[in-house]
C-alpha cells in the first residue's frame, strides 16, 4: 500500500453493477471408451498442408495387445499392426507405469513398420 499526501477531494462513486443471476446445473459427461482399434482406424496422418503422407496410405485398424511375461522381470510383449496389416510383436522391458506411457505413445500419431514396408517406403 502506498501512502500519499492528505487530500480533501472525494471521487464520485461508481454505480453498482447490475445484478447477475447464475443458474447452475449438474453436468454429466459420458466416458469416451474408444479402444485402440477404433482410434487407429479413425487416424488419418497429414502434413500441415493437409495432403496425405504417401499416396494410397490408409492405416487399417490394428489391435494392440500388451501381455506381462512375469512379475519378476517386468518384460511385456506388445503386439501392434503395421499399416499393411502385418502384426508386429515387440518385447519391452519396463515398469508398469512406463508401459502405460508406451501404450499412450502407440495411440498417438506413431506407426511401427514391418521390415518389408520399411524397406519399400524408406529404402534399405
UniProtKB/Swiss-Prot annotation:
Q: How is it modified after translation?
A: Highly phosphorylated.
Q: Corresponding gene?
A: E7
Q: What is its main location?
A: host cell
Its cellular-component GO annotations read: host cell cytoplasm; host cell nucleus
Q: Which Pfam families match?
A: E7 (PF00527)
Q: What does this protein do?
A: Plays a role in viral genome replication by driving entry of quiescent cells into the cell cycle. Stimulation of progression from G1 to S phase allows the virus to efficiently use the cellular DNA replicating machinery to achieve viral genome replication. E7 protein has both transforming and trans-activating activities. Induces the disassembly of the E2F1 transcription factor from RB1, with subsequent transcriptional activation of E2F1-regulated S-phase genes. Interferes with host histone deacetylation mediated by HDAC1 and HDAC2, leading to transcription activation.
Under InterPro entries, the record lists: Papilloma_E7 (IPR000148)
Name of the molecule in the record: Protein E7
Q: Source taxonomy lineage?
A: Viruses, Monodnaviria, Shotokuvirae, Cossaviricota, Papovaviricetes
Zinc finger motifs (unnamed), residue ranges: 82-117
* Notes concerning its domains: The E7 terminal domain is an intrinsically disordered domain, whose flexibility and conformational transitions confer target adaptability to the oncoprotein. It allows adaptation to a variety of protein targets and exposes the PEST degradation sequence that regulates its turnover in the cell.
Q: Which GO terms describe its molecular function?
A: DNA binding; DNA-binding transcription factor activity; protein domain specific binding; zinc ion binding
Motif Nuclear export signal boundaries: 99-107
- Would the keyword Electron transport be found if you checked this record's keyword annotation? no
Amino acid at each position: 500500500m502506498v501512502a500519499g499526501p492528505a487530500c480533501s477531494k472525494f471521487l464520485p462513486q461508481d454505480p453498482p453493477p447490475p445484478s447477475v443471476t447464475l443458474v447452475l446445473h449438474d453436468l454429466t459427461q459420458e466416458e469416451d471408451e474408444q479402444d485402440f482399434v477404433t482410434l487407429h482406424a479413425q487416424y488419418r496422418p497429414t502434413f500441415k498442408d493437409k495432403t496425405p503422407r504417401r499416396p494410397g496410405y490408409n492405416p487399417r485398424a490394428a489391435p494392440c495387445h500388451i501381455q506381462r511375461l512375469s512379475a519378476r522381470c517386468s518384460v511385456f510383449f506388445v503386439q501392434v499392426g503395421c499399416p499393411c496389416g502385418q502384426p508386429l510383436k515387440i518385447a519391452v522391458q519396463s515398469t508398469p507405469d512406463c508401459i502405460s506411457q508406451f501404450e499412450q505413445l502407440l495411440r498417438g500419431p506413431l506407426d511401427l513398420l514391418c521390415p518389408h514396408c520399411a524397406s519399400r517406403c524408406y529404402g534399405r
